[in-house]
């Protein structure tokens, strides 16, 4: 297999967290292009299926106008049981999410989709991480909501910020819950790219 260079890779996301995580393992995509797609879950769609569909849809949307590139699409979903917790639209919804997660285990699904040029191959990996929050006091809930860290976060949770202090334990991948499973992403990309590890 001929090794590609990273300027042939597009990241279908403008997430600063994901860009920083990729840089952590010395990966800098040639282009960063966010994908504007419909993120409404399908009726009775399960969280894992939704995460896979979103990652794939983001990659496909960007590759449709950039067919000669590899495209990396990523999606992170917070789920309580079968309920998908999307990005909170307002503080009222963020409060509902935080109260729902308080004292309970929940799952974070992060799917990574790599499309090769012209969609000749498609690789998808999904990482599931179990997280348990402490039971939150009213003061903690109000403090977190006032911080506005819930904005633009799946389930209203910013694990790199204040929400991190609510975590009693997690089982799985920490990098995955903040937006990108590093091990799985590295393994996918190393099949095609010269990652300059030496």
Swiss-Prot record:
Keywords: Cytoplasm, Hydrolase, Nucleotide metabolism
CDD domains per record: Maf
Example of a GO MF term: UTP diphosphatase activity
Presence of the UniProt keyword Cytoplasm in the record: yes
Transmembrane segment boundaries: none
Compartments where located: Cytoplasm
Reactions listed under catalytic activity: dTTP + H2O = dTMP + diphosphate + H(+); UTP + H2O = UMP + diphosphate + H(+)
Listed cofactors: a divalent metal cation
GO process terms (BP): nucleotide metabolic process
Protein's job: Nucleoside triphosphate pyrophosphatase that hydrolyzes dTTP and UTP. May have a dual role in cell division arrest and in preventing the incorporation of modified nucleotides into cellular nucleic acids.
NCBIfam families: maf, PRK14366.1
Record family assignment: Belongs to the Maf family. YhdE subfamily.
Protein name according to UniProt: dTTP/UTP pyrophosphatase
């Amino acid at each position: 297999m001929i090794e590609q260079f990273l300027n042939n890779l597009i990241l279908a996301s403008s997430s600063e967290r994901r860009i920083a995580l990729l840089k952590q393992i010395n990966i800098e995509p040639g282009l960063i292009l966010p994908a504007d797609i419909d993120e409404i879950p399908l009726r009775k769609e399960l969280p894992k299926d939704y995460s896979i569909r979103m990652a794939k849809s983001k990659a496909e949307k960007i590759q449709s106008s950039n067919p000669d590139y590899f495209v990396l699409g990523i999606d992170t979903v917070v789920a309580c049981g079968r309920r998908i917790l999307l990005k909170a639209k307002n503080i009222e919804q963020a409060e509902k999410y935080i109260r729902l997660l308080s004292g309970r285990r929940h799952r974070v699904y992060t799917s990574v989709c790599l499309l090769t040029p012209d969609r000749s191959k498609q690789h998808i990996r999904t990482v599931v991480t179990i997280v348990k929050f402490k039971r939150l006091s009213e003061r903690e809930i109000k403090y977190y909501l006032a911080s506005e860290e819930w904005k633009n976060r799946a389930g209203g949770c910013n694990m790199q910020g204040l929400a991190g202090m609510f975590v009693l334990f997690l089982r799985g991948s920490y990098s995955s819950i903040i937006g990108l499973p590093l091990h799985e992403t590295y393994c996918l990309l190393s099949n095609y790219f010269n990652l300059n590890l030496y």
